[in-house]
Amino acid sequence: AFAGILADADITAALAACKAEGSFKHGEFFTKIGLKGKSAADIKKVFGIIDQDKSDFVEEDELKLFLQNFSAGARALTDAETATFLKAGDSDGDGKIGVEEFAAMVKG
């Protein structure tokens, strides 16, 4: 799904780094997968993949399963990790993350 945007080796390394429950840190993950240095267009493409229901927002249930977008066998985020991730990205307080909020969080 991320071919041409992200390198498989970077994704594998990023997933390995947050295998343990409670170890997911979105900023570190975005850096490790190589997303931080990507263009706005590439970040928007990644957002489109993560936005499973195509609502133009990433909601809490989609964040919980965030890692599984990168590998089907990846773990779900814990409730605490999901809440922290949502709070970090939801700058307008509407309970979901839009594409601009996502881009700002990635560039963080």
From Swiss-Prot:
Keywords of this entry: Acetylation, Allergen, Calcium, Metal-binding, Muscle protein, Repeat
Residues recorded as bearing N-acetylalanine in the entry: A1
Single GO MF annotation: calcium ion binding
Top-rank lineage group of the source organism: Eukaryota
Entries under InterPro entries matching the protein: EF-hand-dom_pair, EF_Hand_1_Ca_BS, EF_hand_dom, Parvalbumin
Residues binding Ca(2+) 2, per UniProt: D90, D92, D94, K96, E101
CDD domains in the cross-refs: EFh_parvalbumin_beta
Record-listed Ca(2+) 1 binding positions: D51, D53, S55, F57, E59, E62
Function in brief: In muscle, parvalbumin is thought to be involved in relaxation after contraction. It binds two calcium ions.
Family classification: Belongs to the parvalbumin family.
Something else known: This is the major hake parvalbumin. This parvalbumin has an isoelectric point of 4.36.
Protein name: Parvalbumin beta
Organism per entry: Merluccius merluccius (European hake)
